[in-house]
Design a protein with these regions (language model features):
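Segments forming glycine/polar-rich beta-alpha architectures that bind adenosine-containing cofactors
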Residues: 128-191
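Flexible loop/turn segments at secondary-structure boundaries
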Residues: 8-9, 159-163, 281-285
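The C-terminal output helix
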Residues: 10, 37-51
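His/Asp/Glu-rich, glycine-adjacent segments
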Residues: 47-118, 124, 128, 168-175, ...
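Alpha4 helix (beta4-alpha4-beta5 surface) of REC/receiver domains from two-component response regulators
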Residues: 6-22
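C-terminal output helix
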Residues: 28-37
Length: 294
């Protein structure tokens, strides 16, 4: 902790550059010193206690919510609270609450499955529910009237907790707005991702665009080989003309991802660039075969 009479900005910047923990300017009263010392010595303990208290309160609130009927928006809110609290508690393993979180998540999953079974059929006819085929219309096309390039990333099999980690690295570079949509069933890649790019449900792709729908005899990855063409057909149906040719890339391993980073400046010339990040999905499917990933 640096205590000084000097209030010049250059000294403050130099002190920050030296990674000081706190900066106090004279005259200093005892309460300032006390809070600086407590933050350094007991800060983690105090934060852990506060986190524990907030989680216990949330645990009780979620337990009450699970006893009552909820709509999709309330379930989404519950899911966010569960994941975000788990994310916070991961920073404080000394609290010993991980098993409690796991148990409540399991109970929530069971109740949510029942909720989906009761309501999924109705969602298919509800225009207020954003499903996989509606993603591009709702979240991508509205940006096409802007003068700059539009990048559409699909990170297959990424969980919300994984996004929270990524978000920490992006929030200083971008203005981030989070929203949620409801995935279709089956949620497997060949169905869900084709639905996103085509704007159709899988049965409609097979009926309207049979040449772009692969049979179930193919593997999961070849069943998604026509995503660029499906997106082009969706643009045609919406009578949208791009300023440049649609660009589509699929990142199947980190090395190819690094190559794309090296060429990122050239992508700025494109009107729309769609990028599928596939290696997260491949990694998830490899867990059962790779001991280190278990």
């Amino acid at each position: 902790v640096m205590v000084t009479k000097n209030e010049t900005e250059t000294l403050m910047e130099e002190a920050i550059g030296e990674k000081i923990s706190d900066y106090l300017t004279k005259p200093v009263n005892p309460s300032q010193v006390l809070i600086a010392v407590k933050k350094l010595i007991e800060g983690r303990k105090i934060l852990g206690t506060k986190t524990s208290q907030e989680y216990i309160q949330q645990f009780n609130e979620i337990s009450r919510m699970l006893l009552n009927p909820m709509d999709l928006e309330e379930w989404t809110s519950l899911y966010r609270r569960l994941v975000e609290s788990e994310f916070e508690l991961d920073q404080h393993p000394e609290l010993g609450l991980q098993q409690t979180v796991t148990d409540q998540r399991r109970e929530s999953n069971q109740e949510f499955c029942k909720f989906v079974e009761r309501n999924y059929k109705g969602w298919l006819e509800n225009p207020d529910i954003v499903l996989s085929p509606h993603v591009v219309d709702k979240y991508v096309f509205p940006h096409l009237n802007t003068p700059g390039p539009v990048f559409f990333f699909v990170i297959d099999c990424m969980r919300y907790d994984q996004w929270l980690v990524m978000e920490q690295h992006l929030q200083d570079l971008f203005t981030i707005k989070k929203d949620f949509y409801t995935g279709i069933l089956p949620s497997a890649t060949p169905y869900a991702r084709n639905a996103i790019f085509s704007g159709y449900f899988p049965s409609d792709i097979e009926r309207v665009l049979p040449g772009l729908w692969s049979t179930g005899e193919d593997d999961d990855y070849s069943m998604n080989k026509n995503e660029k063409e499906l997106l082009e057909k969706l643009l045609e149906r919406r009578r949208i003309r791009l300023r440049t040719e649609l660009k589509y890339y699929k990142i199947i391993d980190p090395e190819y991802g690094k190559q794309m980073v090296g060429n990122i400046a050239s992508f700025a010339k494109n009107h729309v660039t769609a990028i599928v990040v596939n290696f997260v999905d491949m990694l998830a499917h490899s867990r059962s075969d790779t001991p280190i990933l278990k």
